[in-house]
Amino acid sequence: WDLECKIKNTSIWKLMGVTKPTTLPGSYTVVLDEPEKMIEDVSNHLEFPTLKLKVNKNDLHQILTKTRELSPNKVLIVDANEAFNIDDLKSNADLFVKTKIDLIEQPLLSENDNELKGLNFPISLCADESFHDSSDLAKMAHKYNTINIKLDKTGGLSEALKIVKEAKKLDLNIMLGCMVSSSLSMLPLLPLYEYADFIDLDGPCFIANDRKNGLIYENGMMLVKEDLCWG
């Protein structure tokens, strides 16, 4: 895609027929730590519209309750990274509802996610480790409400574009996600922003030196400049 843009002397936005945004809502990930340190991290990043909390089954009540108190109007995502079993998930349902969690990412081990089939859970569940590319889509529809698309898993924008179109037919919501990596790994997902229900592209926030002309995060927003290093 980037090469075609250069050959045709155009932008990825024009090539794909997508309106280029000037800003997109940013997300910040609070990594798993002692509850007090996690809550301090939350309090230091309240400018972000979305906060994602990496958790396991320990100290959930303290972490979620205090985070919601500090951020009453934020989108809150809980990322269990496969740390729950099905009983953990069910037993904390009331807590998730009370603290108005918007999304729970990969609650169970991917090998155990058949246990989610037919579960009428009150919070949207998102597949991450369970989902890699379009060949997994049919398996997701009866277990999850949302899929996390990462270029590190799909292999590139072409496959990601195929995924979002097929996912919408299956009534699956879309999260645009990332690993800890530079802006070069985020930028090819940006043209899909109109499909996204959640945008979680904070990878460059966790590296010392990002690519030149990469994403800029300002007041919790991603600034989409004209002279980006891709597209």
Placement of each model-derived feature along the sequence:
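Active-site-adjacent beta->alpha loops and helix N-cap segments on the catalytic face
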Residues: 35, 56-72, 84-89, 108-120, ...
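Glycine-enriched alpha-helix->loop->beta-strand junction motifs that scaffold or abut catalytic
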Residues: 46-49, 70-74, 94-102, 119-125, ...
